[in-house]
């Protein structure tokens, strides 16, 4: 895949900010490596820096603590996956070093870095070198506007609604699970993520899942990320016998 100029700039900014992520938590925004013209306005909440999820449930529930509204065929597939996992944990797609995919990527045990710019927000996950670029200059993603194909992490666009970053993503393939227990999804999956800074060191995420092939209605789940101080990233390379 050819890297466009925005991706290149984002990767450069990500590299520059990795070393300063810990300092940013204590000293406020650190925009080293980001040109002045691309820095977010001072009035915008600063979600940049390193984050981790202190509590990582294996099975994702809805915001009211219930099982997602699976359709009959999806429920049968879910139950099969759970039975297979009991027999052999390596039936999990990530055992073959595949990306975690949507939603589940936030529940892995490795930290992530958020790079915040005026026109783009980038999520750089230590897990398996996974990254997401969220374009803030376009409307909701449309797959029929070019030659895009389905991918593990989809195509994301975002916007700020007051103090909340709203990210719309679609264009996923169906090769990943939504959580560690085997929740399925298909290629019609669309996600809406809302990220709200609750305080300087707490970021709340609310994700709404819409997938008419697997769920009878849209459903939402939530999680909490905590800012990391003195974060020193390490290289995380998946190998066939690696447990993520």
Where do the language-model regions lie?
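Bacterial N-terminal signal peptides that target proteins for export
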Residues: 2-12
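Bacterial N-terminal signal peptides
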Residues: 10-20
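PEST-like low-complexity, intrinsically disordered acidic/proline/serine-rich tracts
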Residues: 24-244
